[in-house]
């Protein structure tokens, strides 16, 4: 009797994890889209936005965040206002897009709550 419940429990747990990760992916994509609309100089000239899977990293130090913030990227405004530097793990999301026939890519780093983009390259 107990062994018949195991597959049901596994299915429920897997479904819960799947829905939670889909929600995080969607939230991250929305934050990046809002960041682009606000900070990209040519946001209305890009098409074909394609997002990779959301990932996490511990390998981004405060000094690396400073470097990315200072360098920025082509097509983006120079004086972007960021929030406070986060502590702990960061999420990252890669986005590919087309601008004037060229396929370009940027990586966006988000805080652990997926509330804001803290740096990008």
Please report, for each region that a protein language model flagged, where it lies by residue:
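Sec-dependent bacterial lipoprotein signal peptides
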Residues: 1-22
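Cystatin/cathelin-like cysteine-protease inhibitor module
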Residues: 22-121
